[in-house]
Each structure stands twice: as C-alpha cells, then as structure tokens.
C-alpha cells in the first residue's frame, strides 16, 4: 500500500435533488438541508447511506486526510459468468463509483487523535468481500500495526463476493487474523457499523474489534432476515438485526447518531492512545511484592494523603447491623452517580457480545483526574422503578461476562481497572443457572487474578458474596465506612443457622460484615471515610473522599510493572486462611519455574496449541 500524493480532504459528493422523499418517514425533505445534516432526515432521524468519500469527509479532521492507494488483486480468478460476466460487473462498478474497489483506506485524525481507517462503499457490488477488499482491510490493519495507531473500520456490505468462490471465503480468515495481530500488539480497534453489514464481513473483521459502534437503524447479521424466513420459516420480531435490537442483545457497544460520531470516536481514541504516566509513589513499609504488600503499600499507616483509614482503631466501634441499614439506603450514591461525578470523557460499553446486556452491570472507559481508566460496577438505582430496571443490582451471567470483556480490553490497552461494588449478590434463578452463573463468576475470579494492570476495587454499599467478589480480586480492596462485605446476607445466614430471619442483627455481628472488622481481618486494605450520617447525606463529600482514595491507590500502583502487579495480587489472596509461623509471614506464592527451551523456530504458544488440539 502506498500513500497518494495528495493530503487534501476528499470533497464530499453532496449533490442531491432539490427535494427528495425520506425512505424512513416518506416525507418530503429539502435536499440541501438533508445534505448539510449529514444525510440524516431532519424529521424522523433516518440515516441515508453515504459513499466512502462522504464518510471520510464526515469523520476525519479537515486537512488531515491521506488516502492510501490499495493494489487491486486478481480481478476475476474464476472467470465467473452468471447472467453477465463478473469482469463486466467490475468494470461497471468502477465506472459508476469512481473507485477501484469497495473500500477506501486512509490515514487521518478525529478531533486531533490519529487513526487509520478503512471505509466500505456499498455502491461497489454491494460492498461485497472479495480478495481486493480483504487485501485492503488487511493492509489497513498492517499500517495500524506498524505505526501503532488505532484502527477504525466502517462497514457496509451484503456479504461475501460469490463470484470469487472460496477465495472470497478465505478473506474472512485473513482479515480476522489481522485483527488478532492488533490485539496482540495492544492497539485499539473500533468498528462503525452502517446499514447494511451482513454475511462474511459481519462474521469476520466487523465484529472482532474492541468497540462496536452502530448508526441508528443499521442492520448487522450473518444471515439476512429474508434468508432466515425462507429457509427455516421462522417468524422474526420487529426490528430484528437493527442496531437497537443488537444493543439490547449485547452485540454492539453503543449507538451513535451521525452528528455525534466524531466526538464519540474521539473520546474512545483519546482514552486509548494517551496512556497513564507514572506518578509519585508513597513510601512503602519495607515489605516485598511477594507478600502482597509491595511498593506503595501504606496499610500500616492510620491515614495516607488519600484520606483512607488503615487503622481499625480509628473507626467507630458500633453494632454491625447499623452498617447494614446504612449500606442499603436507596439515597446512597450509585455507581453511575460516582462515574458521573468522577470520570471525564466517559463512554459506556454494552453487552457480552453473546446474547445479553445485563442492566445491573455497567462498564466503560474514561479519565479519572486525567488518567485513562476502565471503570466497572454494579448499578442499583434510587427508586423502585430503577431498581426493577437494573435487576436490583444483581448481575446475570451476561453481566459478569460483560465485565470480563471490558477487563480484557483494559489489559490489552494497559489501562487501570476500577471496580465499584454495591450488590446483594449475583442474580439467582432459573435463567441465571441455565446460563452458567457459577461459571461466569469463577471465570472472573481467575481472570482478575492475572490482569497485568493495576486493579482497585471499592465496596461502596453492599458486598454480597461471590457476586461481589467477582469484581473484587484487586491489588487494593477498599470499602466505604458504611459499606458491608459478607459471604451471605445477615438475613440469609439467620434463616439457615438461627432458623429465624429476624435474627439478622445477631448474624451480622457474628459474620463481622462491617468495615472495622474487615479492616482488622485484612480482608480490605483501607476504609474510605463517609460524611456523618452516611454518603447519602452529603454525596459531594462522599464523592470527594472516593476520588482521593482512588487517585491515591492508582498513584501507588502506577510504577509497578505487570509481573509485580500480578504477583502481589495473587499473594494478597494466597495468604487468606494460610497458617503463618509465630511472628512470621505467610508463605510466599509459588512462582513457576522457567519453561525449558524448545527447538529452533518453535514457541511455547505453538506447543500449547498442539496440546489443546490433541
């Protein structure tokens, strides 16, 4: 691929009829108004298709565009003829569109953020995926890899190009592995799904990116609705395969109207490309990373500059049931309340990419005091309506899988993870069990233990059992002063062991669910102060205290390299329940010995793949 000599912004072909009829609402629209609005109906919001040139002009900063020449591969490998020779169809498409193929590759910037983009054009044989398109998409990936620049794919396709036979099919694998190389290199990839995106494109590079953005009403799928209805006679629901349907079912991350695409994409690119720097570290207490109290750990102090209480004697000695009552108050700030006050450039990501978007779990990217972070948390609500809509803050298996997906993105991009926990526990019930609730929780525990980035967890309200722990395998585990954290709810424990749910206060005391007891036991590393009367009395003060605690914890962890972070985190949890010699420390975790060398040209990954295959 070579860059064209021109660096001028492509002229958008805004020529249109004086008046036209909207395909969405069938109303008459003044053509120039329609063009000025990005080809979006001002009456109903219907988004018309754009050419690749129009799309590039819409998205990239003026003066930043450098179109990359893409070589045209074998034009007609099968000498294919149906009602018309394929070679004739190619010539006609090139003449009518002015393009050599169904994709345009360019470098540029979006609100100052560098990006490599590949933009498909549906006018060219329905945006079908053939060898030339596959080569262009792969070439764009290779440019992004070589220049370590985020990749933006704008898709519009009816599927594979049948006239190229199995060669077209191979482009799915070719482009998929190119995306995989960007994953390995830690480079952000984003898809913008436009209408329509189907077949081989949908089942390869379009849906393999880190973030999937869709325009309103855009359709995405493997088999089209007509194919499904005709082959298996299945009745499909209204809105099937639209962006809105797919958002509800966890396939796309967000829907962005065309007028908001540039700021939406710029937020994503900005967070992903400006990595957090190191920060001054609070002097440690001399312990090594191996016991989970490495550099920057200040749990021996009563207070740090972050305001976190680390000495249980400085916390009020009260009955734990008081904390239970305060932790459950509906007025307490929720995860989204804290995010709204603390996180700049917030972009929420949706869905587990499988079937669901659990409303009880929120996750996304943003900045905390300028530091790019990933924030994940359970969300309850403040009213009965909100609680019901959010499943009472009890995540489904899909919620935990959504959290895991975003944690993996954090690991890929090298971003710290913050989790905010306020849940009575994982959602119980038939559907949760059918979908593998236990497996989802277990997989999160394993995943978090090995994340190569700083992880800070805060129990802000209720920390209920494994459903809370699935977000709390962290380098620093904090809790708010009036939060609780327990293996079971006090009422549940009372019902089982006391045979009387009314014995909840007794169970709370026996379980030691309060911050003072948990800090003394080392379950949490520090306690975030709350205003007198609770966080709901003065949410601003509670937010300020949480900000100080989070920024302090991240500053402590920022200088640590990935192996140290992982070793320290594993050591932290390794020591729980481990008998220690009198006056001595708990056993250090076992560090695997170096693997023996392999033959020339082979890697351990090759060996592992071979074992799995066998």
Curated annotation (Swiss-Prot):
Residues 18-287 form the CoA carboxyltransferase N-terminal domain. Its main location: cytoplasm. Residues 18-556 are annotated as: Carboxyltransferase. GO terms for biological process: fatty acid biosynthetic process; malonyl-CoA biosynthetic process. Its cofactor is Zn(2+). One of its GO terms (cellular component) is acetyl-CoA carboxylase complex. Residues 579-602 have a biased composition (Low complexity). It is found in: Cytoplasm. Residues 297-307 have a biased composition (Gly residues). Keywords: ATP-binding, Cytoplasm, Fatty acid biosynthesis, Fatty acid metabolism, Lipid biosynthesis, Lipid metabolism, Metal-binding, Nucleotide-binding, Transferase, Zinc, Zinc-finger. Residues 1-250 are annotated as: Acetyl-coenzyme A carboxylase carboxyl transferase subunit beta. Residues 272-314, 577-614 are annotated as: Disordered. It is an enzyme of class 2 (transferase). InterPro entries: AcCoA_carboxyl_beta, Acetyl_CoA_COase_a_su, Acetyl_CoA_COase_Trfase_b_su, ClpP/crotonase-like_dom_sf, COA_CT_C, COA_CT_N. It comes from the Bacteria. The keyword Transport does not apply. Acetyl-CoA carboxylase is a heterotetramer composed of biotin carboxyl carrier protein (AccB), biotin carboxylase (AccC) and two subunits of ACCase subunit beta/alpha. Component of the acetyl coenzyme A carboxylase (ACC) complex. Biotin carboxylase (BC) catalyzes the carboxylation of biotin on its carrier protein (BCCP) and then the CO(2) group is transferred by the transcarboxylase to acetyl-CoA to form malonyl-CoA. This is Acetyl-coenzyme A carboxylase carboxyl transferase subunits beta/alpha. It comes from Parafrankia sp. (strain EAN1pec).
């Amino acid at each position: 691929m070579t860059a064209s000599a021109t660096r001028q912004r492509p002229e958008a072909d805004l020529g249109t009829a004086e008046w036209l009829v909207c395909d969405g609402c069938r109303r008459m629209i003044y053509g120039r108004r329609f063009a000025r609005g990005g080809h979006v109906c001002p009456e109903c919001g219907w988004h018309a298709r754009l050419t690749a040139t129009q799309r590039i002009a819409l998205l990239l900063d003026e003066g930043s565009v450098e179109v990359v020449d893409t070589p045209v591969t074998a034009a007609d490998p099968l000498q294919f003829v149906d009602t018309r020779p394929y070679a004739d169809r190619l010539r006609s498409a090139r003449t009518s569109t002015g393009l050599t193929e169904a994709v345009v590759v360019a470098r540029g910037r979006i609100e100052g953020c560098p990006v490599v983009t590949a933009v498909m054009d549906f006018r060219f044989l329905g945006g079908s995926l053939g060898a030339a398109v596959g080569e262009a998409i792969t070439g764009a990936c290779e440019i992004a890899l070589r220049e370590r620049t985020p990749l933006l794919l704008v898709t519009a396709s009816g599927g594979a190009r049948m006239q190229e036979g199995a060669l077209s099919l191979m482009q799915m694998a070719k482009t998929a592995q190119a995306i995989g190389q960007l994953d390995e290199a830690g480079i952000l990839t984003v898809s913008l799904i436009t209408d329509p995106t189907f077949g081989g494109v949908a089942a390869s590079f379009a849906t393999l990116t880190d973030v999937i953005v869709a325009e309103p009403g855009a359709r995405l799928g493997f088999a089209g609705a007509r194919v499904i209805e005709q082959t298996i006679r299945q009745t499909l629901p209204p809105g099937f395969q639209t962006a809105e349907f797919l958002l509800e079912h966890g396939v796309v991350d967000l829907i962005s109207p065309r007028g908001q695409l540039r700021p939406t994409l710029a937020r994503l690119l900005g967070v992903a490309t400006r990595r957090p720097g190191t920060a001054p570290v609070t002097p440690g207490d001399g312990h090594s990373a191996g016991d989970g109290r490495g550099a920057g750990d200040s749990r021996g102090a009563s207070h740090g500059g972050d305001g976190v209480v680390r000495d249980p004697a400085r916390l009020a000695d009260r009955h734990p049931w008081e904390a239970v009552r305060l932790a459950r108050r509906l007025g307490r700030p929720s995860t989204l309340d804290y995010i709204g006050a603390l996180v700049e450039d917030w972009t929420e990501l949706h869905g587990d990419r499988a079937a669901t978007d659990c409303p009880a779990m929120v996750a996304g990217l943003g900045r905390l005091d300028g530091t790019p972070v990933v924030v994940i948390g359970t969300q309850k609500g403040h009213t009965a309506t909100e609680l019901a809509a959010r499943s009472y803050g009890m995540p489904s298996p899909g919620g935990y899988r959504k959290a895991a997906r975003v944690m993996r993105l954090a690991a890929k991009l090298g971003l710290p993870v913050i989790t905010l926990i306020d849940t009575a526990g994982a959602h119980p019930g038939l559907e949760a069990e059918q979908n593998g609730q236990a497996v989802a929780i277990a997989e999160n525990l394993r995943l978090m233990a090995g994340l190569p980035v700083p992880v800070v967890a805060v129990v802000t309200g209720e920390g209920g059992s494994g459903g809370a722990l699935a977000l709390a395998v962290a380098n620093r585990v904090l809790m708010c002063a009036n939060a609780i954290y327990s293996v079971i709810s006090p009422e549940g424990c009372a019902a089982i062991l006391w045979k009387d749910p009314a014995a909840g206060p007794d169970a709370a005391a026996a379980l030691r669910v309060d911050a003072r007891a948990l800090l003394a036991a080392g379950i949490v590393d520090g306690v975030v102060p709350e205003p007198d009367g609770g966080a709901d009395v003065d949410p601003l003060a509670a937010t300020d205290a949480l900000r100080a605690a989070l920024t302090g914890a991240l500053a402590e962890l920022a200088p640590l390299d990935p192996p140290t972070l992982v070793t320290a985190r594993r050591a932290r949890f390794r020591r729980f329940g481990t008998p220690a010699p009198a006056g001595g420390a708990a056993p250090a975790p076992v560090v695997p010995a170096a693997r023996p060398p392999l033959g020339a040209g082979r890697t351990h990954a090759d060996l592992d793949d071979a074992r799995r295959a066998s």
